[in-house]
C-alpha cells in the first residue's frame, strides 16, 4: 500500500491538474468574443496656450485644453470572465517633429456591477495635454478615441479600441485669457 503522504500528493496533483484544465476551458469560452462597441465623442471647447513647462524645462510648450462629451454603453462587454474595465481616452496627432504623438487625456475604472452606461457632458481632461514643442497650435488633424483594457478572471489581458473616433482641430491663435 501507499503511504498517506503519497496518496495526499496524488490527490493534490490531480486536483490542480483538473483546476488548470477548467481554467483553460473557461478562458477558451470567451477568447473569441468581440469586445468592441460604439463610442460617441464630441469636443465642446478647444483651446491652446503657450506656457512654460517647468516639469521638463523652462522652455515654452503648447498646452491644450479640451472639454468633451462622451456617450457609450459598455454593458455588453461584461460577461462572467470580465472582472473590470480600464477605460482611457487618447488624443493622437502628428507634428513636423514627430510622426505619431499619443496623449492619454482621461481614464476611468468600471468594476463588474457598476453602471457601464457612460453619458458625460462637458468633461474636462484628467491629465494635461502637453506637446513637447509647439505642435498643437493650428493642428488640424487631432483625433480622440476611447480604448479599454479588459481585466479578466482567467486568460489574456486584451486592449480594445472603440469603433468611432472624433476629429478636431486646435485654433490658429493662442488663448490669452485664464482658463
From Swiss-Prot:
UniProt lineage: Eukaryota, Metazoa, Ecdysozoa, Arthropoda, Hexapoda
Gene giving rise to this polypeptide: Spase22-23
Sorted UniProt keywords: Endoplasmic reticulum, Glycoprotein, Membrane, Signal-anchor, Transmembrane, Transmembrane helix
Subunit structure: Component of the signal peptidase complex (SPC) composed of a catalytic subunit twr/SEC11 and three accessory subunits Spase12/SPCS1, Spase25/SPCS2 and Spase22-23/SPCS3. The complex induces a local thinning of the ER membrane which is used to measure the length of the signal peptide (SP) h-region of protein substrates. This ensures the selectivity of the complex towards h-regions shorter than 18-20 amino acids.
Protein name per UniProt: Signal peptidase complex subunit 3
PANTHER family noted in UniProt: MICROSOMAL SIGNAL PEPTIDASE 23 KD SUBUNIT SPC22/23, SIGNAL PEPTIDASE COMPLEX SUBUNIT 3
Species in which this protein is naturally found: Drosophila melanogaster
Transmembrane residue ranges: 13-33
Superkingdom of source: Eukaryota
Positions on the Lumenal side per record topology: 34-179
Record's keyword annotation contains Transmembrane: yes
